[in-house]
């Protein structure tokens, strides 16, 4: 069977569509945001492919797998088992790293366990048990005629006179010993000082190196090893030549340090055998950070320099009063004027010094108690450790920072694992390399003999996996990078690389915009990877808006014509040529150039006197970057993946602005020297792709603030007033108006164990969330439930006479969200949709013209036509005097910017510098900028 037949697909907004999709081809599904692409790719094809495979398993196995809901479709045939690679499922497990997700780390553990060389942490001597034959051979390799003596260490760095030891050695027939580095006669040994440490080594044999000494040396070594418990030393009899220490034990000959046999689990930070005991393999330690605990060092303790310990908190302030009396300091003096020692006592405690504390209870009785002062940081730590209250924990988390573990230095591994080497390189050193550097290391790694044979297969697996990661544009990441810190696009491409590593055949892969966060330069490699997956014999379905991906596809499906209720139909399908020739295809019109996003004829000029200057940003891979952002312009931050854009803008620039303009207390900017020019703004707004809410109770109406005036309208109707209903009656989050059977959720979750959890509409309210009495109240003929079911477009028409609601709905339409429902659960919105809901909320607020907006890849999930709408909105914000800073790879956005700041030249350690800045026309001329190379043709 060479095709997949879909008949009557009605999932979500799909309108009973029929499709024939070729198998073993690269298929791109494109169309407007919200047109139904994901409904077709993920909720129909993937869901059915995965469901059929899981259903073939036993009931016992099924209970461990989440079975997907059966899609609303009449018939699908020709499906393979399906694997989806989405952006959403970025791991939040602090133990997941790039190395563990891709399994490279598992192979590295195996490699180090099998061919690694353990060394003593203190003396850096290889730990290797040697046979007597090996010891003899080593001595015979010395220059012929060299005079050597064989020593057996008897006492090592121990105090005492050791008279008995020396007598015993003489009684056994030994003539000489080396005591504290000096050779002496045992018939007349020196008197040793009782309280000094001494080392005694008995001379077992003295030889001139010759080839016929094998037997004699072997016997002498046997004697020496027996005397010393496994250690022997060969030392020159004359001069200061090098000594050779031999060990018959798997231990350091100098200090006796030994370790168990090497096993892969010793190198796992997720296993007690390998994890650092201090941080349990997390690599970081949490601590209460004085910088977060001290709210404002310019205030006094009485005024609230430390929140919760001011005059308002009577119990804690009593303690500080007693402390101030004891140490004679002023509670009304600014905290930063107190001496360092006093500040230390307040934060870390008085140690063993007891202080007389005066406690006054509610009745006014005074009680005196003597005890040391615990210290504010220790008090917070104890409360955090002992509390069972989530709210207290959440409050205290604000004051916690993390730092690299003091024991393992952030490597996550115990001492033994950190001291195993392959060619002078440890495992922690390898995982700190970028993937590109790690690939070079293993490509040039030379092992010899048996070790080379053992390592051959493991090295091939490591090299293959590293190469796949390079192919999907992730050469700048390092293997120790925590999965939590990856962007959606990076996480998706890592899973893509893992799948290629698996080398499966006959599978249907479904991908969701794998080009997110990729620079045009890396896009080509990604497309080669996708075609490689196809060439292995797989069907590759990609939901994508990227022009290169659409042109590269064997088969294109264009869903539309509009979004939401106006979409859900197949507008065009076939080869690239067929799409271009189809007059109904909006995608085809943009690809053929019939429609295009126009380059502005005139750029907004920059005022050199109005800029924000950030000096010396050095977080992650940034190399003391000086950033200059023009005020009142639309600026684009560009650069290849991993060049430092997010570190510079999100982790440094935004966090500084958030702290200084919005008064944030817990934002910790990456390191920088200084910033000036923030006085041009009154607030900063970061519009990212995180969900607008994590429960079905959050929806666009509640998030944008439309729901409050809607509830007020309903409570103002004649019916509501006669019944005494207030706006709270129309909330599904509080008792009163909501249906209590489902607590306002509209659905009831039924756990089915080895079947998927079933969400059934509530029997009582039939999924409407409200009780019957509330639903009897109508505004213009509609109940509150019917209003929540309206699309933004319908609601805009319905509420046109109500300016406060109509204005907010208009902004949702302006950002291209006319198709979403007011009450649509936040959990069903894509990252791009969530970002645009946030943008709409900000647009609907009163505009001061002094706002700094920061957006990270706002074109994610957007079709060419949606991008046109988004740009209209962003340009409107700029025209009102606001400053818009956008991190973006999309050339249609970059070419319309007023100002470009390009980072690079490469990703990871090869990046972290500003290599070009200016208008798009200026930047396009700059040699050495990858962005310039792709931007130049767009400006013609």
Curated annotation (Swiss-Prot):
PROSITE patterns named among the record's database cross-references: ABC_TRANSPORTER_1, ABC_TRANSPORTER_2
Biological source species: Vibrio vulnificus (strain CMCP6)
Principal subcellular localisation of the protein: cytoplasm
Protein purpose: The UvrABC repair system catalyzes the recognition and processing of DNA lesions. UvrA is an ATPase and a DNA-binding protein. A damage recognition complex composed of 2 UvrA and 2 UvrB subunits scans DNA for abnormalities. When the presence of a lesion has been verified by UvrB, the UvrA molecules dissociate.
Entry keyword Cytoplasm: yes
UniProt GO molecular function: ATP binding; ATP hydrolysis activity; DNA binding; excinuclease ABC activity; zinc ion binding
Single Gene Ontology BP annotation: nucleotide-excision repair
Assembly behavior: Forms a heterotetramer with UvrB during the search for lesions.
Name this protein carries in UniProt: UvrABC system protein A
Zinc finger (C4-type): 252-279, 739-765
CDD domains per UniProt: ABC_UvrA_I, ABC_UvrA_II
NCBIfam families in the record: PRK00349.1, uvra
């Amino acid at each position: 069977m060479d095709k997949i037949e879909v008949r009557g697909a009605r999932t979500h907004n799909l309108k009973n569509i029929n499709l024939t999709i070729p198998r073993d081809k690269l298929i791109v599904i494109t169309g407007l945001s919200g047109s139904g692409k994901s409904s077709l790719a993920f909720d129909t094809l993937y869901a059915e492919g995965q469901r059929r495979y899981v259903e073939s398993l036993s009931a016992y196995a099924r209970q461990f797998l989440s079975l997907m809901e059966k899609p609303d479709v009449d018939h699908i045939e020709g499906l393979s088992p399906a694997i989806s690679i989405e952006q959403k499922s970025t791991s939040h497990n602090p133990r997941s790293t790039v190395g563990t997700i891709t399994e490279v780390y598992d192979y590295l553990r195996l490699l180090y366990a099998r061919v690694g060389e353990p060394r003593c942490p203190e003396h850096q001597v290889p730990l290797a048990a040697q046979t007597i034959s090996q010891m003899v051979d080593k001595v015979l390799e010395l220059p012929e005629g060299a005079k050597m003596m064989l020593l057996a260490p008897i006492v090592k760095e121990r105090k005492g006179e050791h008279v008995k030891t020396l007598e015993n050695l003489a009684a056994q027939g030994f003539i000489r010993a080396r005591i504290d580095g000096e050779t002496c006669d045992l018939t007349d040994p020196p008197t040793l000082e009782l309280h000094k440490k001494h080392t005694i080594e008995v001379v077992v044999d003295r030889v001139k190196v010759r080839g016929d000494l094998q037997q004699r040396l072997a016997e002498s070594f046997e004697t020496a090893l027996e005397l010393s418990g496994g250690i022997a030393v060969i030392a020159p009899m004359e001069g200061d030549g090098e000594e050779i220490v031999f060990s018959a034990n798997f231990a350091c000959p100098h200090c006796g340090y030994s370790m168990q046999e090497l096993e892969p689990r010793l190198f796992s930070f997720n296993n007690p055998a390998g994890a650092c005991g201090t941080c349990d393999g997390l690599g970081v330690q949490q601590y209460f950070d004085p910088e977060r605990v001290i709210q404002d060092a310019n205030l006094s303790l009485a005024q609230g320099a430390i929140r919760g310990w001011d005059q308002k908190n009577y119990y804690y302030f009593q303690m500080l009063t007693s402390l101030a009396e004891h140490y004679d300091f002023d509670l009304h003096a600014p905290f930063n004027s107190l001496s360092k020692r006093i500040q230390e006592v307040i934060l870390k405690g008085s140690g063993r010094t007891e202080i007389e504390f005066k406690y006054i209870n509610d009745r006014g009785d005074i009680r005196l108690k003597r005890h040391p002062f615990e210290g504010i940081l220790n008090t917070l730590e104890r409360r955090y450790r002992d509390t069972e209250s989530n709210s207290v924990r959440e409050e205290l988390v604000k004051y916690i920072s993390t730092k690299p573990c003091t024991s393992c230095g952030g490597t996550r591994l115990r001492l033994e694992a950190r001291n195993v080497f392959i060619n002078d390189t440890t495992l922690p050193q390898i995982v700190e390399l970028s993937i590109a550097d790690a690939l070079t290391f293993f490509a040039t790694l030379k092992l010899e003999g048996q070790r080379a044979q053992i390592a051959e297969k493991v090295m091939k697996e490591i090299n293959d996996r590293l190469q796949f990661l390079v192919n999907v544009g992730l050469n700048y990441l390092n293997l120790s990078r925590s999965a939590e810190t990856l962007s959606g696009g990076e996480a998706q491409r890592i899973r893509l690389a893992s799948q290629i590593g698996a080398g499966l055949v006959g599978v249907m892969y479904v991908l969701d915009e794998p080009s997110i966060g990729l620079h045009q330069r890396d896009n080509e490699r990604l497309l080669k990877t996708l075609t490689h997956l196809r060439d292995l014999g797989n069907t590759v379905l990609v939901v994508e808006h990227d022009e290169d991906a659409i042109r590269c596809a064997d088969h294109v499906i264009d869903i539309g014509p509009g979004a939401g209720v106006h979409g859900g139909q197949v507008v065009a399908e076939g080869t690239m040529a067929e799409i271009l020739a189809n007059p109904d295809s909006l995608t085809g019109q943009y690809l053929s150039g019939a429609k295009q996003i126009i380059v502005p004829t005139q750029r907004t000029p920059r005022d050199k006197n109005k800029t924000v200057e950030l000096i010396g940003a050095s977080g992650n891979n940034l190399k003391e970057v000086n950033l200059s952002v023009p005020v009142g312009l639309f600026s684009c931050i560009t650069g290849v993946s991993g060049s430092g854009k997010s570190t510079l803008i999100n982790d440094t620039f935004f966090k500084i602005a958030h702290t200084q303009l919005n008064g944030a207390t817990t934002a910790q900017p990456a390191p920088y020297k200084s910033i000036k020019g923030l006085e041009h703004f009154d607030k900063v707004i970061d519009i990212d792709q995180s969900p607008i809410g994590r429960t079905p109770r959050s929806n666009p109406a509640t998030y944008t603030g439309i729901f409050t005036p809607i509830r007020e309208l309903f409570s103002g109707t004649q019916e509501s007033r006669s019944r005494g209903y207030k706006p709270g009656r129309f909330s599904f989050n509080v008792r009163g108006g909501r249906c209590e059977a489902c607590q306002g959720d509209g659905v009831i979750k039924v756990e089915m164990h080895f079947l998927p959890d079933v969400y059934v509409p509530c029997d009582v309210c039939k999924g409407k969330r409200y009780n019957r009495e509330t639903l009897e109240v109508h505004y213009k003929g509609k109940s509150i439930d019917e209003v929540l079911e309206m699309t933004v477009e319908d609601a805009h028409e319905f509420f046109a006479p109500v300016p406060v609601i109509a204005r907010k709905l208009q902004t949702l339409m302006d950002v291209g969200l006319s198709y979403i429902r007011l009450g649509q659960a936040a959990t069903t919105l894509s990252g791009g949709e969530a970002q645009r809901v946030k943008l709409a909320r900000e647009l609907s607020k009163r505009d001061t013209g002094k706002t700094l907006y920061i957006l990270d890849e706002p074109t994610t999930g957007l079709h060419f036509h949606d991008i046109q709408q988004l740009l209209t909105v962003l340009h409107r914000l700029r025209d009102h005097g606001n400053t818009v800073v956008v991190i973006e790879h999309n050339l249609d956005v970059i070419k319309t910017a007023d100002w470009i700041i390009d980072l690079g030249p490469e990703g990871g350690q090869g990046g972290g510098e500003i290599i070009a800045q200016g208008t798009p026309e200026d930047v396009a001329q700059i040699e050495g900028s990858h962005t310039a190379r792709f931007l130049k043709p767009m400006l013609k």
